[in-house]
From Swiss-Prot:
Motif residue range(s): Involved in the stabilization of the negatively charged intermediate by the formation of the oxyanion hole: 83-85
Residues forming the catalytic site: 169 (nucleophile), 271, 302
UniProt name for this protein: Strigolactones hydrolase CXE15
Annotated organism of origin: Arabidopsis thaliana (Mouse-ear cress)
Enzyme Commission designation: 3.1.1.-
UniProt keyword GTP-binding, yes or no: no
Keyword Nucleus: yes
Single GO MF descriptor: carboxylesterase activity
Gene3D superfamilies for this protein: alpha/beta hydrolase (3.40.50.1820)
Induction of synthesis: Up-regulated in root explants but down-regulated in shoot explants on callus-inducing medium (CIM) incubation.
Keywords tagged on the record: Cytoplasm, Hydrolase, Nucleus, Serine esterase
Amino acid sequence: MGSLGEEPQVAEDCMGLLQLLSNGTVLRSESIDLITQQIPFKNNQTVLFKDSIYHKPNNLHLRLYKPISASNRTALPVVVFFHGGGFCFGSRSWPHFHNFCLTLASSLNALVVSPDYRLAPEHRLPAAFEDAEAVLTWLWDQAVSDGVNHWFEDGTDVDFDRVFVVGDSSGGNIAHQLAVRFGSGSIELTPVRVRGYVLMGPFFGGEERTNSENGPSEALLSLDLLDKFWRLSLPNGATRDHHMANPFGPTSPTLESISLEPMLVIVGGSELLRDRAKEYAYKLKKMGGKRVDYIEFENKEHGFYSNYPSSEAAEQVLRIIGDFMNNLS
């Protein structure tokens, strides 16, 4: 402990964009906005979007996307998209997340719900998971109160019996947490029914390094950065084997007896997180009674589908997600 009057020291520095000081103060740089602004917002004339608040106590907002071509006679499935950012960064308004949601809505002919959630280290885990539950509670409230008719003036019909959760990176971890909480029966939201989960480059961790983690850094991601995200987001004193980071850690609750809805795991073959995602899918499959599809895109890095939305691989990802949804409807 420093003496009185001693200036606080930088305990963690995350790319110069986020600093955690020794006295607990968190400093965030506005430069992150400058970085995200380098990605142009997509001008998609086929999708309407609007913002709404879903949790007033924490002032948390979400963004709704609806394809203009949607017919009032056709009920739209719901896709709840959780953005990535290592639990420390990210927002529904970041261009690549916004653009991806526009594409999800138009390609899947679905109503897309893209929420913000509390970020670490100001709000360490399980804050993000609690907010994810709040999103589904909000969705339930819309279903039972017919509030969906107020989302858009034309009163688009929404099928709450066909809800899908899609998560990117840390959002993929959130999707896993929701799948487990639903599967264990701790969340009951009838008439809202989650039919399946899509985990895209899910952010999982562990103390023992995998081969892909020991491989070369990616253009936008390094092992050091992943470790910092865990130190900043996990409860103080927790290791990467904590169950919120490692679903199969030495002290993690078993998933053997939990009934999980079908899951689709998508990962790039050159991702540092590839082996974590592959192990996750393999171990769930091995338990039996759990449907898990694993798709790996050769030579692709983390976030290839949102960072390069016009690529053939990104278009293929959308087709795979669409097929996954259609097979479960």
